[in-house]
């Protein structure tokens, strides 16, 4: 098994496209060449902009926000300049940057919601007024997403999400072939399975395969069974790599199956590559990003205005089909604004029954209490 690179949140690591470079034009060029933006650094020009907080907002975000036209409407309508830094590290690193930087360095960040409860507990992010945001336009299940609420108070809002299930080459496999994770263990696909190097989604999906409805809340026996499943899967896996490595390998025909979802498949399919994705009968796990405001920002008014924009339909309809990677979006008005083919590709065609049909078999990705043991099991799997 080839392990190319440790990758902390694969749906947004190492796929960031610089719109000012020759790789910024199309996703097809990205697949052909690969792309990565380095982890954020606090440059002097960025720090100097903090002084003009009354007319600006400082944002640390994962990829997509930097693409042309994403933030233009916000800046033109509000007169607020967005000082944007794209983050290519982990959620923990993003939150630590907000926590350890001087107040106002970052007014807004966009971590995975699984990290919001600890950020609330540590006093890093500010409480939000639900009435300030278009939650009535959201899918109900996302508006009430448990990790962003605590004791009836709102601290963050999901504005981008998706799922992990199976991404597959539909010229080689039918939908019925991949309706169960059993396909990953079929001897005929030995060495043809690729995995993204991030333990939570891979182990979460395999935990669902083992029959655990709450895939990250396992007792000792269930966790032992999960390790057995990992051991069984190991000979089937030919590649563990970062996002660009896996996508390029699949696009080149080297691999046919991956534990992944629309954030990988939709863009490749749109570019004419033969990949589809689905949630197997055993279920899958979600990924998401949630916007939140620093508890120490001196610039909360502008930060809230920014959150209002990125939770609204105009922005989300663009973010859904960002060149960086596609995603589902929770604002139903944004879904309606998408072309019909994009809505179908992103499972947003039937928005009235989205909660009860599509989301019913997905479990929120979370950080398990015995996280270190999970990480150790994943490292052992990779090195076997």
Mark where each language-model region is.
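A ligand-binding cleft/hinge motif common to bilobed small-molecule-binding domains
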Residues: 115-118, 251, 257-274
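Early extracytoplasmic/lumenal segment of secretory-pathway proteins
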Residues: 54-118
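N-terminal secretory signal peptides
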Residues: 1-29, 44, 52
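Conserved C-terminal helix/tail region of periplasmic/extracytoplasmic solute-binding proteins
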Residues: 248, 351-384
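Mature extracytoplasmic/periplasmic domains
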Residues: 294-358
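A bilobed periplasmic-binding-protein/Venus flytrap-type ligand-binding module shared by bacterial periplasmic
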Residues: 165-172, 207-211, 287-300, 318-321
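Periplasmic-binding protein-like
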Residues: 223-232, 271-295
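Extracytoplasmic ligand-binding site segments that recognize negatively charged/polar headgroups
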Residues: 67, 87, 91, 110-251
């Amino acid at each position: 098994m080839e392990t190319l690179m440790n990758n902390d949140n694969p749906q947004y690591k190492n796929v960031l496209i610089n719109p000012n470079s020759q790789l910024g034009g199309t996703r097809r060029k990205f697949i052909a060449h690969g792309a990565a933006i380095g982890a954020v650094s606090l440059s002097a020009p960025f720090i100097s902009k903090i002084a003009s907080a009354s007319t600006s907002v400082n944002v640390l975000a994962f990829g997509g926000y930097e693409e042309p036209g994403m933030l233009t409407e916000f800046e033109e309508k509000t007169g607020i300049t967005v000082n944007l830094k794209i983050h290519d590290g982990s959620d923990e690193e993003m939150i630590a940057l907000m926590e350890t930087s001087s107040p106002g360095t970052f007014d807004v960040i966009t971590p995975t919601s699984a990290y919001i409860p600890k950020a609330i507990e540590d006093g890093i992010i500010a409480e939000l007024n639900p009435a300030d945001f278009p939650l009535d336009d959201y899918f109900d299940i996302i508006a009430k997403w448990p990790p962003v609420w605590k004791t009836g108070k709102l601290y963050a809002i999901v504005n981008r999400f998706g799922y992990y299930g199976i991404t597959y080459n539909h010229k080689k496999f039918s939908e019925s072939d991949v309706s169960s994770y059993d396909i990953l263990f079929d001897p005929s696909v030995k060495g043809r399975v690729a995995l993204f190097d991030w333990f939570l989604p891979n182990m979460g999906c395999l935990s669902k395969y083992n029959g655990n409805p709450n895939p990250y809340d396992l007792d000792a026996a269930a966790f032992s069974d999960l390790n057995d499943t990992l051991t069984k899967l190991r000979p089937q896996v030919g590649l563990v790599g970062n996002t660009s490595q896996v996508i390029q390998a699949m696009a080149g025909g080297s691999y046919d199956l991956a534990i992944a979802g629309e954030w990988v498949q939709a863009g490749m399919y749109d570019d004419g590559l033969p990949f589809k994705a689905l949630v197997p009968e055993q279920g899958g796990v979600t990924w998401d990003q949630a916007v939140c405001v620093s508890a120490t920002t001196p610039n909360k008014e502008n930060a809230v205005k920014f959150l209002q924009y990125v939770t609204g339909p105009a922005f989300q309809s663009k973010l859904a089909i960002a060149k960086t990677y596609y995603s589902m979006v929770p604002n139903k008005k944004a879904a309606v604004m998408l072309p019909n083919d994009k809505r179908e590709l992103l499972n947003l065609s039937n928005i009235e029954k989205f909660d009860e049909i599509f989301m019913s078999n997905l479990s929120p990705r979370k950080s398990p209490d015995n996280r270190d043991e999970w990480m150790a099991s994943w490292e052992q799997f990779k090195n076997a």
